[in-house]
Amino acid sequence: MKLTVCEFPDKRSRREAAWKELIQFLHAAPTDVVVLPEMPFSEWNIFTSETVDLNNWRRALADHQDMLPRFSELDARIVLSSRPVEETGKRLNQAFCWTRENGYQPVRSKYYLPDEPEGRETTWFARGDRHFTPITIAELSVGFQVCSELLFTDASHEIGRAGAHLIAAPRATGGHRRWRLAASLAAIMSGCFVASANRRSEDSKAFAGCRSVVSPEGEVLAETDLASPYVTVEIDLEDAMRAKRTYPRNLTI
């Protein structure tokens, strides 16, 4: 199975050009699965406000809704990411799966919400799902750990015990080494491949890009960088199944 991770610009003004570049990249080398960053079609700075600006919120909803029909422009079977939604009066950061056959499918909403100057997520979002149940898409089983959730290895372990092949980790973060370490530890604890996708800032260090695909043993298989914002690797789903039977995944709990 071919798996692609992407950097995506934070600036709204650069988004259309980046989308067209991604279309061209996948046209030249089609893939099975694309992982995009966390809420990729909104500028993140709106979520740093300590009060909710409803105009900005509605714009974020519209920006993501408008992009859903455009996923079919990508030479990919599956798109994994998250987006802002409003359901039953709650604002949520909803992980989702899009497939060429069945369109949009919600999976779960982000549970671990930071309250930091870089993101006042407890202000903007309600807590979502405490459990991390994977979704099955044809031959692929995938669980989501959205951004800060990747730091919680109990969630990784839960996803692995449920038999998943892949953890999708859409993110919006800086370049602290914790993120690379977290992706590797999530893979080791779950026996899953981990695909992490991040934003990149052009005029600051707020978002570092540099995202990766990690093997079930925690080895980095490929990483993006400024010159190569998209990277595709071939993975064998059976590697994830074999990893479940080995240390430390086979420990009794």
Residue positions per predicted region:
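Active-site-proximal beta-strand elements of phosphoester/diester hydrolases
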Residues: 1-12, 35, 94, 107, ...
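Hydrophobic residues at beta-strand termini and immediately following loops
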Residues: 6, 108, 135, 197, ...
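N-terminal phosphate-binding loop and adjacent alpha-helix
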Residues: 6-24
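Short, flexible loop segments at the rims of nucleotide/cofactor-binding pockets, characterized by
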Residues: 9-14, 56-61, 120-124, 143-148, ...
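Cys-nucleophile CN-hydrolase/nitrilase-fold catalytic domain and related Cys-dependent amidase chemistry
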Residues: 20-101, 176-189
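CN hydrolase (nitrilase-like) catalytic-core segments centered on the catalytic cysteine
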Residues: 60-78, 150-230
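Short beta-strand scaffold segments in enzyme catalytic cores
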Residues: 82-83, 93-98, 133-135, 196, ...
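Active-site catalytic loop in hydrolytic enzyme cores
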Residues: 87-162, 179, 242-252
